[in-house]
Amino acid sequence: MPIKYFEAPEIKKQVDQLAEECEFYHVVPQFVFCVRSKGSKARRTIARIHGLGRIWQGVLNLPPSYTIEVISEIYDRMSADDRERTLIHELMHIPGGFSGGFRPHKGYVERRNVDAVYKKLQSDRAAKKQKKLFFQ
């Protein structure tokens, strides 16, 4: 069965929210798209990020853009925490210049860095919730 791609508005909403909450201010939400794929033969891949390379940007006269693809067979069975970590991981591949290129795994997009961002996110959410309860 060939891979099929479907729009994923719920993933897009989560990605936009994570980019804001994680303070990834270099990410331009209107140029980050999200799809769900079905039929992939990948066994270890949970999600992928695709960039619109400079040559295509120039030829098509388009701005830098990224597409985050989640592989439904694996991603959908994960816990909510692991799904968030996965999306953070993919967002961390987007460089500060939002140029269409990628940051590498080695030295930046590593588990410990993803976990550090996720831990800060959880801490910020808890503080926000506590503040909300305090002022009610």
What is each stretch, according to the model?
Residues 1-81, 97-136:
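Metalloprotease/metallohydrolase-associated module, dominated by Zn2+-dependent proteases
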Residues 83-97:
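Active-site recognition of the HExxH zinc-binding catalytic motif
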